[in-house]
């Protein structure tokens, strides 16, 4: 059971790291995530959200 938990935590951490690395910040200022959707689609990404006043785009959810 301990081995299963260790593997599960390791996979979770790796998936979080991969998800962060795949994201891309684009030079578009925003106040809400809705403002980023079109800009992220034009940049070739699927999803976008506003973080710290700039659009952060990711290829998957």
UniProtKB/Swiss-Prot annotation:
Query: Coiled-coil segments, which residues?
Result: none
Against PROSITE patterns, the record matches this protein to: SCORP_SHORT_TOXIN
The entry's localization annotation reads:
Secreted
Q: List the Pfam families.
A: Toxin_2
Top-rank taxon, per record? Eukaryota
Q: List the disulfide bonds.
A: 30-50, 36-55, 40-57
What InterPro entries has UniProt attached to this entry? Answer: Scorpion_toxin-like_sf, Scorpion_toxinS_K_inh
* Lysine amide: residues bearing it: 60
Output a single Gene Ontology CC term carried by this record: extracellular region
Q: In which tissues is it expressed?
A: Expressed by the venom gland.
Q: Which residues form the signal peptide?
A: 1-23
Tell me which UniProt keywords the record has, alphabetically: Amidation, Disulfide bond, Ion channel impairing toxin, Potassium channel impairing toxin, Secreted, Signal, Toxin, Voltage-gated potassium channel impairing toxin
Question: Function of this protein?
Answer: Inhibits voltage-gated potassium channel rKv1.1/KCNA1 at nanomolar ranges (IC(50)=90 +-2 nM, reduction of current by 30% at 50 nM or toxin).
Q: What is known of its domains?
A: Has the structural arrangement of an alpha-helix connected to antiparallel beta-sheets by disulfide bonds (CS-alpha/beta).
Similarity field: Belongs to the short scorpion toxin superfamily. Potassium channel inhibitor family. Alpha-KTx 03 subfamily.
Indicate what this protein is called per its UniProt record: Potassium channel toxin alpha-KTx 3.18
Organism equals Mesobuthus eupeus (Lesser Asian scorpion)
State the organism's lineage.
Answer: Eukaryota, Metazoa, Ecdysozoa, Arthropoda, Chelicerata
């Amino acid at each position: 059971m301990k081995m299963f938990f260790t593997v599960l935590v390791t996979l979770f951490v790796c998936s979080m790291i991969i998800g962060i690395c795949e994201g891309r910040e684009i030079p578009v200022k925003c106040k809400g995530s809705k403002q980023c959707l079109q800009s992220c689609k034009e940049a070739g990404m699927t999803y976008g959200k506003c973080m710290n006043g700039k659009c952060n785009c990711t290829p998957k959810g």
